[in-house]
């Protein structure tokens, strides 16, 4: 901790876990030597060095000397690991110790606690630690006005059995501790927004989402002057938008569908992502300085270079200067069949055969979508809906086939456009042989 403080990476009073890295020194087992050999070596050393030199060298016994050498090697190995660990802290961003946040008229206080990321996030497949995450990350502890630990209303709830991917975590958390913004891109329904939400759920960070594909205007982001009644007198007062309110807090500001945002809105975001603060010209030139733990997370169907797939209307190329403000790009793809099957099995407890049919159907629909055959991507939300519907209808319909047929039709087929529906039905027929699907409106 003292080393981290000297580097400016840990403020006075900030907490860390007692052990910052798994580098505890092991005590060496005593080395044993055959009694005859031991006596002979001791005699040879003392005879060769002489009594005075032997005493100066601190030699008393060959077993003690060999045990000391063994211990030195263990100490050196542990020291190398600690140096490697501390070097990883060199480029981390400044960390705040504590602060306050206004939430729905109440004041919550937060305390920053440094925790080892490797202990917070496990490999979902093996349940083992991800060794590349052996570094500290700031987490938050929220308290109400009475000092009791509480939950910030904008901190997402954890999703049971959520499947983190090691590569996503390494990139996202590295960007987080270095103070960098992240750009998550991928097809519809891959979990681009869920990734920062579930990271935030673990480290107790609030998430403020802004959907940029709607009718959001510049004033919604920055704020505007409003006329208010002050004791019978009408006065103008500046009302802050989401940007200045979020920037002063430790949080993730998620810019959903950033690649379809309006140009004037994008220029405001570009200015804010520079990290130097936001100048509110509408409020007399007031400068809003960002909290050291404030981060932007963008989600998009593209890498910012326009629609690569030809299926996302409204996606436009982004300004190069804006893209430079997001140095970390994470491609979020659909879960593999194995990952999705494991998730659905743990969540819904459905028979393996049913899970296999659902995930196979989802995979075929996604392939058809990516190849331009349909405009219906079957997302993990859709596979979850099919499982939920199947569990419900299984207790109502006389056969499991009818329950499955109704679940698939309700969750996927009914929302498909008519020019896509026949292809979706063909894929469903191939995956659910005992069911009878139709492309006509039911």
Give the residues covered by each predicted segment:
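Heptad-repeat positions
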Residues: 1, 7, 34-37, 41-48, ...
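Surface-exposed polar/charged interaction patches
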Residues: 6, 10, 43, 47-51, ...
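Acidic, proline-/serine-/threonine-rich low-complexity intrinsically disordered repeat tracts
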Residues: 12-35, 57, 96
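AAA+ P-loop NTPase catalytic core and its hallmark functional loops
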Residues: 78, 82-356
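Short, hydrophobic/amphipathic alpha-helical patches that form generic packing surfaces
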Residues: 170-179, 385-389, 406-414
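Conserved AAA+ ATPase small/helical "lid" subdomain
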Residues: 334-336, 340-406
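C-terminal engagement/docking regions of AAA+ P-loop ATPases
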Residues: 396-442
């Amino acid at each position: 901790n003292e080393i981290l403080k000297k580097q400016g990476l840990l403020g006075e009073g900030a907490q860390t876990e007692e052990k910052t890295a798994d580098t505890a020194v092991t005590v060496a087992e005593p080395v044993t030597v055959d009694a005859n050999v031991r006596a002979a070596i001791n005699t040879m050393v003392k005879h060769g060095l002489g009594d005075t030199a032997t005493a100066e060298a601190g030699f008393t016994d060959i077993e003690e000397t060999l045990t000391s050498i063994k211990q030195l090697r263990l100490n050196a190995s542990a020291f190398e690991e600690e140096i490697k660990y501390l070097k990883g802290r060199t480029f981390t961003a400044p960390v705040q110790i504590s602060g306050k946040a206004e939430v729905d008229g109440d004041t919550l206080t937060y305390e920053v606690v440094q925790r080892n990321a490797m202990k917070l996030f496990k490999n979902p497949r093996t349940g083992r630690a991800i060794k590349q995450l052996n570094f500290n990350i700031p987490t938050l502890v929220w308290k109400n006005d009475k000092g009791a630990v509480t939950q910030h209303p904008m901190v997402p709830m954890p999703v049971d059995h959520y499947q983190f991917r090691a590569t996503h975590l390494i990139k996202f958390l590295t960007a987080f501790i270095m103070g960098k913004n992240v750009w998550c891109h991928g097809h519809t329904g891959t979990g681009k927004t869920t990734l920062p939400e579930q990271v935030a759920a673990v480290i107790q960070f609030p998430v403020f989402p802004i959907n940029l594909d709607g009718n959001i205007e510049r004033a919604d982001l920055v704020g505007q002057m409003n006329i208010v009644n002050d004791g019978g007198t009408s006065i103008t007062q500046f009302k802050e938008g989401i940007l200045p309110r979020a920037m002063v807090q430790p949080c993730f500001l998620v810019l959903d569908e950033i690649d379809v945002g309006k140009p004037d809105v994008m220029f405001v975001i570009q200015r804010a992502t520079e990290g130097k603060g936001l100048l509110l010209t509408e409020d007399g030139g007031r400068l809003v300085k960002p909290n050291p733990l404030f981060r932007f997370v963008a989600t998009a169907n593209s890498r910012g270079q326009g629609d690569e797939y030809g299926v996302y209307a409204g996606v436009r190329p982004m300004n190069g200067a804006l893209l430079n403000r997001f140095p970390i790009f994470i491609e979020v793809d659909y879960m593999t069949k194995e990952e999705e099957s494991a998730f659905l099995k743990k969540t819904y407890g459905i028979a393996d055969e049913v899970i296999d049919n659902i995930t196979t159907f989802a995979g075929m629909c996604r392939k058809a979508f990516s190849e331009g055959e349909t405009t219906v991507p079957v997302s993990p939300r859709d596979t979850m809906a099919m499982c939920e519907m199947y569990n419900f209808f299984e207790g109502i319909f006389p056969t499991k086939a009818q329950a499955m047929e109704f679940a698939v039709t309700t969750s996927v087929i009914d929302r498909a456009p008519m020019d896509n529906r026949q292809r979706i039905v063909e894929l469903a027929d191939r995956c659910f042989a005992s069911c009878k699907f139709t492309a006509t409106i039911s």
